[in-house]
Amino acid sequence: MMTVAAEIRGSNPEKLLAPVLSAFWDEDESWTLDVYRRHEGYEGLRKALAMAPDDLIAYVKESGLRGRGGAGFPTGMKWQFIPQGDGKPHYLVVNADESEPGTCKDIPLLFANPHSLIEGIVIACYAIRSSHAFIYLRGEVVPVLRRLHEAVREAYAAGFLGENILGSGLDLTLTVHAGAGAYICGEETALLDSLEGRRGQPRLRPPFPAVAGLYACPTVVNNVESIASVPAILNKGKDWFRSMGSEKSPGFTLYSLSGHVAGPGQYEAPLGITLRQLLDMSGGMRPGHRLKFWTPGGSSTPMFTDEHLDVPLDYEGVGAAGSMLGTKALQCFDETTCVVRAVTRWTEFYAHESCGKCTPCREGTYWLVQLLRDIEAGKGQMSDLDKLNDIADNINGKSFCALGDGAASPIFSSLKYFREEYEEHITGRGCPFDPAKSTAWADRTEVKA
């Protein structure tokens, strides 16, 4: 497990990082209850249980915590939507189905510090009056599944789950559910269908999950990092949380730095930090190379170039620059990377993972792949570039969920910034890039030669 927070915090005079969730990832057995309690674990829960549920929701709302799964919707407001006194059971579902290319923050968090999530779940369930919560985990990550099961067992044994938690009268059952590997189940309503035992496909909304979610009952669906951030807010205070980040995007978050960089890993910092600052503190791009393009929030967000190095990485800053913060998956590519090749691979992923429910997404992603493969192989025509734009435009905003939008984003942005590179594939009858040079071992191979 790589953690860079402690090292950089000690050596960087600006102290740009804000390790909270990742503060003790580098300790031995950081995932255990004993280590978590040494770092004030479950103290936030004690303070939460001393508040009335409605006051707790208002407190989280006032903290300014926004969803960390991509959309950035205020967490407290989502909790507030749950109707009270309706006589129905309420559910909390944690979306841990992290599957998008480049997105890799929730899995390390669950692996290194699962109790932060469990504590956050208990707090959230107390707030929304829920007695049953679920963690929907991506099925392929079996080591994380085992670690989660062990953490849940520890929490039950210590009285943080089960009946009459800490003498508060709160009863809570927590179920860990492993998905079957479908990316579409990361969409909240498809996730609920999957959890109910049906094929994962997005639902028509309204009704929204807050009214009719799991088993047609009021349900809150939150991201792992969103819920795991709640205990620190309760323990250290909303003013402490708001002292970090920006006015409209307060607090800390995990940035996943990957690609052609010298120091890939999870960097926990206040919202509003820039990629330039993150690269400066992590060693920059790999030696001898320069940044060509990057994604601010995973493959589903419009790409940026080196012109955007100083864009504040918060919801407003990235949005104003023409993209989305998304999951803060900062994939960085240097000048050896073929944009057409990268976009083709991403589009192949979306075509494969489309559930097929919506015709624009099902058919559109298929035809995008056919055109991109032809262009990459040197068989394309100039008219194909406008055709790519047209097909992407017919997908964007015309499906039940955002998978189609995610497939269209790289098409629009790559043609905007790198149209000449597409044209070079067509006029030059093939890709001018050597794929081997963009591999992690390319420079080592050249040195040996």
From Swiss-Prot:
This enzyme's EC code(s): 7.1.1.-
InterPro entries: ComplexI_51kDa_subunit, NADH-UbQ_OxRdtase_51kDa_CS, NADH-UbQ_OxRdtase_suF, Nuo51_FMN-bd, Nuo51_FMN-bd_sf, Nuop51_4Fe4S-bd, Nuop51_4Fe4S-bd_sf, Soluble_ligand-bd
UniProt cross-references to SMART domains, sorted A to Z: NADH_4Fe-4S
Family in the record: Belongs to the complex I 51 kDa subunit family.
Catalytic activity line of the entry: a quinone + NADH + 5 H(+)(in) = a quinol + NAD(+) + 4 H(+)(out)
GN (gene name): nuoF
Residue positions binding FMN: 179-226
Superkingdom field: Bacteria
Residues that bind [4Fe-4S] cluster: 355, 358, 361, 401
Binding residues for NAD(+): 67-76
Function: NDH-1 shuttles electrons from NADH, via FMN and iron-sulfur (Fe-S) centers, to quinones in the respiratory chain. Couples the redox reaction to proton translocation (for every two electrons transferred, four hydrogen ions are translocated across the cytoplasmic membrane), and thus conserves the redox energy in a proton gradient.
Co-factor note (free text): Binds 1 FMN.
Broad class of enzyme this protein falls into: translocase
GO biological process, one term: cellular respiration
NCBIfam families: nuoF_fam, PRK13596.1
Single annotated GO MF: NADH dehydrogenase (ubiquinone) activity
TM helices/strands, residue ranges: none
Keywords assigned by UniProt, alphabetized: 4Fe-4S, Flavoprotein, FMN, Iron, Iron-sulfur, Metal-binding, NAD, Quinone, Translocase
Protein name: NADH-quinone oxidoreductase subunit F
PROSITE patterns, A to Z: COMPLEX1_51K_1, COMPLEX1_51K_2
GO CC terms of this entry: respiratory chain complex I
Cofactor: FMN; [4Fe-4S] cluster
